[in-house]
Amino acid sequence: VVDAGVPLFCVDMVPTSDTLVWTQVGVDEAEFGRLQAEKLAEVLPENGTVCIAMNQLGTNSQINRTRGFEEKIAELRPDVTIIDEQPADSKTDKAMNLVEDWLQRFGADGINAIVCQSAMTVQGVVEALRAHDLLGKIYVAAQDFTQPSGTEWLETGATYVDVFYDYNALAKGVYDTILD
């Protein structure tokens, strides 16, 4: 890419190479985590507990969404404890397995909220909680879940908050950047 003089545009990712010249089109990933923390801070009980189902380790979204959540929840609710953080890798089945593991380790009463970093993770978390009749009993903070069931889940209490990711605006930003 460098030797050929081909421009590199990164959509929603930040390359780790120091030798590449690139343009990134994306969002403030930490803001996603901060928004989730702000909403959960309003409802978590005193000394509440949270598990985070993260995106793939080392990705811009995983690092910054996690950091944003951790910093904001510590600021707003220092009594809240993040009891576990594990990668779900944006996979529904992996998220379901995480919830099963957390329920075994901490019990249903030991988890007050689960923070999700992608739509597929949300789907797995909700399905696992549904299987244990825990929807609405453990808060779910969602991200990116724009599919029709996402709205239904907010309305029925399966999820408590969903931070919207405007993919149309992202696509327009990429298009405009390439044309510049």
Model-derived features with residue positions:
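A residue-level marker of the well-folded mature domains of exported/periplasmic proteins
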Residues: V1-D180
